[in-house]
C-alpha cells in the first residue's frame, strides 16, 4: 500500500471532527429535538452516503458509485446483520435495494416509497418514519430500519431515526479510532481518498 499523505490524513481528521461530528451528527441531534421527522430521516440517509466516502470498500461493492458509498457505511452500522437481511428481502421482492427506494425517494419525493412492479401494476410496500424503534425483548438492539406489522397485521418498513442517529454516532467514533488512533492502513487510505473526493472533487 502506498505511503499515506500526512497532510491529507490531517485534513480527513479535521473533516471528521468539524463536519461529520460537528455539523452532520450535531444537525441530526438538533433535528431530532425539533421533531422534524422526515427531515431527520432524510439527513440520516444522505449523511450515511457521505460518511461512506471515507470508509474502505466492503466485500460486495455496487458498481454504482453513490450506492457503494452508502453501503460502506450502512453495512458497518451496529445492526448490520439485520440491515443486510432487510436489504436482501427488499431486493428479492422489488428487484431494487433499500438505497434505491429509501435514499432516492426521500431525496427526490420526500417520502420513503418502496415500489414493487408486477407487469403493469405498481404495488407499494408501506413505509413509515418514526422517532424510536422499540423491542418487547429486553436489551434487544432495534436496527434503524426494520420490518414491522401495523395494527391490522400488514407488513411495513420502519425508519426509526433516533436508532439511526445512535448507530451513526457509534460508527463515526469507531471509524475515527481505526483511522487516526489504531492507524489501520485501509481506513487511512480511504480517509485520504475521501478528502480528494469531498474537498477536491476527485472521483472514487
Region spans (language model):
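Residue-level detector of alpha-helix boundaries and kinks
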Residues: 13, 32-33, 87-88
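Hydrophobic core segments within long, regular secondary-structure runs in both alpha-
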Residues: 21, 25-28, 68-71, 100, ...
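Aromatic-acidic/polar surface patches that form glycan- and anion
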Residues: 17, 33-40, 91-92, 96
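Short, mixed-charge amphipathic alpha-helical segments
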Residues: 71-105, 109-117
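Short, contiguous, well-structured surface segments enriched in hydrophobic/aromatic residues
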Residues: 30-80
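Polyanionic, low-complexity intrinsically disordered segments
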Residues: 2-23, 27, 94, 110-204
